[in-house]
Amino acid sequence: MHPNDQTIFALASGRLPSALAIVRVSGARARDVLAALTGALPPPRTVRRVRIRDVNHELIDDAVVLWFAAPASATGEDVAEFHIHGGRAVLAALVKALASFDDVRPAEPGEFTRRAFENGKLDLTEAEGLDDLIHADTEAQRRLAVRQLGGLLGDRARRWRAQIIEALALIEAGIDFADEGDVQGELMAPALRTIATLHGEIAEVLAAQGKSERLRDGLVVAIAGPPNVGKSTLINRLARREVAIVSPHAGTTRDVIEVQLDLGGYPVTLIDTAGIRESEDSVEQEGVRRAKARAAEADLVLWLGADEAIDVAVEGSAPVWRVRNKIDLVPQADTVGADSGGAGLAANLWQTEGNVAAREAFGISAKRGDGVGDMVEALAGFAAQYFAASGEAAVISRERHRLLLQQAEVMLRCSMTVGLAPELVAEELRLAAGALGRLLGRVDVEDVLGEIFGRFCIGK
């Protein structure tokens, strides 16, 4: 029997032990399994309290079950759910009983969702939205994932593809009736109007998107600078826990340390890098090389150190914010006019260096926390601006979406080339429809399905 024809089961709830656990069963034998273990099949979509017994009539649990007949279920197949007490022994006994049935096996990661996709319960963009929702760590990620799961992009792509196919049908009909007077022109005209409208809509979506697909990975902020300026102390302060070793000895941090933060609902990856300086220690040299490479890849760099060293040490096009640390060590006489957060002090320091307008500047004490709140607030504002298109207007949530929409847009634009033969217009439209079909997971996507569904947990 083909694996897709087998009935699958898995724990669909969280880690045990817990108050309750949910075991989901999907497939042709779900009905038989439920009836055999509970003694009767409950009405569809009805909660029933039952006694679950194994094939030897040994009591497993006093539990609740639900029954969903195909196709009105999450997977489009017959589905049974066992809501049992969340003890490990209870689950083990139920799993043993389920595995005793022929053609019933444990599910692979993401197999329930893949069956839902294959049975037309959701398209590939919605499946990706579900994956993003499961892995969402921040409010902004959750909002975008919920909209994608609800068909934000999928509904548009289906409509666009259907209209392209309609236009293609008109053009092909015109080709068939090319010898019938002006029939071809009469059929081509409305098709080209439709194509122009669709091209405009897709181009508008692509133009409106900023970096919304980056929400899945988050903004990358590198903390860079020479040794012993407080980089590790700052990342510990921002992480609110000890993630980096703090030592008075220069060169303590040898490797890149990463911390995930939620700033204003946006995901931010904070990177503590090795102190950038000349060194004859081969290990420290490698740390400095990695620090420079990571800073060059960052979306924002927080530079702790002398301003004149920034352009030499930091490569790449990311904006650089100058952070003057250890303001608690500055004599009181030098801090007159500084506000409680240290921003005023930062401005004074910048003015003495004659570079006040060059970059954002902050004066902080990573050790005491002075000024850190102002800097965090500014970082949250930077993240919000960076992900500006990830609000309610965002449609694209993955790079795959963008690439396929770009392909469709190019094909539609080519199809509108003045003087292009109808046969070539039809071919461009076929390619555009194919790109949208791959976006939805309806054509030629077998190579990406395993990667997408393999990210899901078992039981989803």
Swiss-Prot record:
Gene3D superfamilies: P-loop containing nucleotide triphosphate hydrolases, Probable tRNA modification gtpase trme, domain 1, tRNA modification GTPase MnmE domain 2. (6S)-5-formyl-5,6,7,8-tetrahydrofolate binds at R24, E81, K121, K460. Keywords: Cytoplasm, GTP-binding, Hydrolase, Magnesium, Metal-binding, Nucleotide-binding, Potassium, tRNA processing. Residues 218-384 form the TrmE-type G domain. The gene is mnmE. GTP binds at residues 228-233, 247-253, 272-275. CDD domains: trmE, TrmE_N. GO terms for biological process: tRNA methylation; tRNA wobble uridine modification. NCBIfam families: mnmE_trmE_thdF, PRK05291.1-3, small_GTP. GO terms for molecular function: GTP binding; GTPase activity; metal ion binding. GO terms for cellular component: cytoplasm. It is found in: Cytoplasm. Belongs to the TRAFAC class TrmE-Era-EngA-EngB-Septin-like GTPase superfamily. TrmE GTPase family. Mg(2+) binds at S232, T253. Homodimer. Heterotetramer of two MnmE and two MnmG subunits. This is tRNA modification GTPase MnmE. Coiled coil: none annotated. The keyword NAD does not apply. It is an enzyme of class 3 (hydrolase).
